[in-house]
């Protein structure tokens, strides 16, 4: 998966198109990512011993990785991800600017 935890991404399709956020978690087996402030759902919570009031909680739901695109660290525009070997290590680069992509995690 070309998106990692801590990356800045923009949503390119769906109900939250155009929103940007930081990737909070990834689910590689399902090809899904959870982005901060994107795809907010309301979850109805029954009262429990720990939360006696229950109620409606708002939380982020995972979205498919094909619906998000990485933001170029140099130009802050959507870009594709490329890979390059430097000193025997594989690093991610932004296709638009050639800048190295570093995660914020």
From Swiss-Prot:
SMART domains: KOW. Transmembrane segments: none annotated. The keyword Nucleus does not apply. One of its GO terms (cellular component) is ribonucleoprotein complex. One of its GO terms (molecular function) is rRNA binding. Belongs to the universal ribosomal protein uL24 family. HAMAP family: Ribosomal_uL24_B (MF_01326_B). This is Large ribosomal subunit protein uL24. It comes from Staphylococcus carnosus (strain TM300). The gene is rplX.
